[in-house]
């Protein structure tokens, strides 16, 4: 496109290769490794020849193979190890027929198959116990004793003492067991008594609350009655306009009820 292409701005940071953190010797990891004898330039790993001198890089897993499958493929034992292809053993047999080594290749493939079965999921490896083999007598079908007669006598005496000690231990264990049972029963009784005591306290509190509620209800009722009686004795508040009108009506009624007042109004004289 040349100069006619669209221009795109690019901004580069101060550390485009992201190496500032690895070159910084004041970080905790750098100082911690130096305490164990590590120096810049040395690798990390079990073996110094195969140690990693560069940073650990993340590789993208773009297949459905399990973890460690690629490493297993790389570490092939021999030329007949079919780590990658499933039908490679058949191909090896065809090559063996052509080269005249069919028997050797078939034997090698059979041994590999047997080894796979043994090392598979249900394969079991039996390990002989050297201690059992050295102390077991196949004729008498008993364990061998290499001690002398004196030691046997001592062992017999020790066994008698041990039997007595075992009896004493059993008796003491029985006593301890009985004491433990009694202790458990006492604990259960104490728990029951505590529960009953708590229930009794709760019932007493509930009764007290009910009594208090009844008393408060009675006091409220009496206060309401007193307030109603006092309210009946208090006259109703009348507005000022109505009070003036009521006075005028009373005066008018009084004038109409009085005969003398009417005569004065109508100017009637009693001759």
UniProtKB/Swiss-Prot annotation:
Residues 157-168 have a biased composition (Acidic residues). The keyword rRNA processing applies. PROSITE patterns: G_PATCH (PS50174). GO terms for cellular component: nucleolus. It comes from the Eukaryota. GO terms for biological process: rRNA processing. Residues 204-221 have a biased composition (Basic and acidic residues). GO terms for molecular function: nucleic acid binding. The modification Phosphoserine is found at residue 230. PANTHER family: G PATCH DOMAIN CONTAINING PROTEIN, PROTEIN PXR1. Interacts with EST2. Involved in rRNA-processing at A0, A1 and A2 sites through its action in U18 and U24 snoRNA 3'-end final trimming. Negative regulator of telomerase throughX competition for binding to EST2 with TLC1. This is Protein PXR1. It comes from Saccharomyces cerevisiae (strain YJM789) (Baker's yeast). The lineage of its organism: Eukaryota, Fungi, Dikarya, Ascomycota, Saccharomycotina.
